[in-house]
């Protein structure tokens, strides 16, 4: 009688069998997901605001995803094309906004600088008045007169003189690039080039993940906001990353950060690097250091208007290391400047290095696709070794 009480119906047996099979499938999928996860190189992009992190991500899309044709995951060519068209339209608006912000910022700064800057041609004052009048207009529709006034002002020597003093106020890096292209951007059929899209500045808020594959190896790159109030979100990304790519705007030695208009940008980057290098949660994660904006650094050094020693007095005593390898045709002043900045970061990493993580510096220009291709190829072996060490396979 007891046996009869424990007997199972056919339906119950079938249900249990189905449950066991479902559990097996779930377990198998979990194992598969774990293998994929362990085989993926996760790279965390860190750095102070406007250092070029998002531009590095754009380069990965150009080099390893599908350019700017959608996000690179669509199997349907029509869907990819539709996504691409939508993205390009959004980017055209972003580029026009960059152009507007650039001319507004420069003409607004003219009267605020000490000493102030005058227009070379006083007859252009009505153009300045127009630009300032549309400064806060929501959903601005970019009428022809906007481009006419912006172009005339950009050709005014007084406006150019104010632009030359842009380290004294907050101006986006791409200002000159887009102001030089007003005649192209104003066209109704304007389609941005890859270089236009690389130069376009949009504030990164939150965390963005880009997935790509190089020689059948999966990479996930996380780009996070660089402004101070974004940094508290970073800690979510720290868990189990293969490496940190720390991006520095090398040309920012004579600029101050947007957040307080006081702290030197390069000093802010050094302080941030130090806090990351010494963070107890990151003591085993190595850092690939991208000393970025080498093109702008070279321009500043050769122009000779802003001397590094005025901001970092120790530069006056610095000599270029014997093992320095300048680019072909590089001016010795540029070589000395870029190695000084490199060594400021290496001083931090060597002062508190305990052999559990390392710093690998590279000189980069994020808007130069070939430069980023070469640098990333150089980094891949390092990343692979970090990954093997992470899972104790090395």
UniProtKB/Swiss-Prot annotation:
Give membrane topology per the record: Lipid-anchor
Sites binding GTP sit at 47-55, 197-204, 223-227, 292-295, 366
Q: Which residues carry this modification: ADP-ribosylarginine?
A: 201
Query: Region Disordered: what ranges?
Result: 1-23, 68-91
Q: Name the InterPro entries for this protein.
A: Gprotein_alpha_S, Gprotein_alpha_su, GproteinA_insert, P-loop_NTPase
Q: Where is this region: G3 motif?
A: 219-228
EC main class here is: hydrolase
Instruction: Cite the effect that the entry attributes to residue 366 to S.
Output: In PHP1A; the patient also shows testotoxicosis; constitutively activates adenylyl cyclase in vitro; rapidly degraded at 37 degrees resulting in loss of Gs activity
> Region annotation G5 motif: residue ranges?
364-369
Tell me what happens on changing residue 258 to A: Increases GDP release and impairs receptor-mediated activation; markedly elevated intrinsic GTPase rate which will lead to more rapid inactivation
Mark out the compositionally biased spans (Basic and acidic residues).
8-23
Q: Which organism is it from?
A: Homo sapiens
Q: Locate the Phosphoserine modifications and list their residues.
A: 352
Q: What is this protein called?
A: Guanine nucleotide-binding protein G(s) subunit alpha isoforms short
Q: Which GO terms describe its molecular function?
A: adenylate cyclase activator activity; D1 dopamine receptor binding; G protein activity; G-protein beta/gamma-subunit complex binding; GTP binding; GTPase activity; metal ion binding
Taking the first listed entry, what is the main subcellular location of this protein, grouped into a coarse class? membrane
């Amino acid at each position: 009688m007891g046996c009869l009480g424990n007997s199972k119906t056919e339906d119950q047996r079938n249900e249990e069998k189905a449950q066991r099979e479902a559990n097996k499938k779930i377990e198998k999928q979990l194992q598969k997901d774990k293998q994929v996860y362990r085989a993926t190189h996760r790279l965390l992009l860190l750095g102070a605001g406007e250092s070029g992190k998002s531009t590095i991500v754009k380069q990965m899309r150009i080099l390893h995803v599908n350019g700017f044709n959608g996000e690179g995951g669509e199997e349907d060519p029509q869907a990819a094309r539709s996504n691409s068209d939508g993205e390009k339209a959004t980017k055209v608006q972003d580029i026009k906004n960059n152009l507007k912000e650039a001319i507004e910022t420069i003409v607004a700064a003219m009267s605020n600088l000490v000493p102030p800057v005058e227009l070379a041609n006083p007859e252009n004052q009505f153009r300045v008045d127009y630009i300032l009048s549309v400064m806060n207009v929501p959903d601005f529709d970019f009428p022809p007169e906007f481009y006419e006034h912006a172009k005339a002002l950009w050709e005014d020597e007084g406006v150019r003189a104010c632009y030359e003093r842009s380290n004294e106020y907050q101006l986006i890096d791409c200002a000159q690039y887009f102001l030089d292209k007003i005649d192209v951007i104003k066209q109704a059929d304007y389609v941005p080039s890859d270089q236009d899209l690389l130069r376009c500045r949009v504030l990164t808020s939150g965390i963005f993940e880009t997935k790509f594959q190089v020689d059948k190896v999966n990479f996930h790159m996380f780009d996070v906001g660089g402004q101070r109030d974004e940094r508290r979100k970073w800690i979510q990304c720290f868990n189990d990353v293969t490496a940190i790519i720390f991006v520095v705007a090398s040309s920012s030695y004579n600029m101050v950060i947007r957040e307080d208009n006081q702290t030197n940008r390069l000093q802010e980057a050094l302080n941030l690097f130090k806090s990351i290098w010494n963070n107890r949660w990151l003591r085993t994660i190595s850092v690939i250091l991208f000393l970025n904006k080498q093109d702008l650094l070279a321009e500043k050094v050769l122009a000779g208007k802003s001397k590094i020693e005025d901001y970092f007095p120790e530069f006056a005593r610095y000599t270029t290391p014997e093992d320095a390898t300048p680019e072909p045709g590089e001016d010795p002043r540029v070589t000395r400047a870029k190695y000084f900045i490199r060594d400021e970061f290496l001083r931090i990493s060597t002062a508190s290095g305990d052999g559990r993580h390392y710093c690998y510096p590279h000189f980069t220009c994020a808007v130069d696709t070939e430069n980023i291709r070469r640098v990333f190829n150089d980094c891949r072996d390092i990343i692979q070794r970090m990954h093997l060490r992470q899972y104790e396979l090395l």
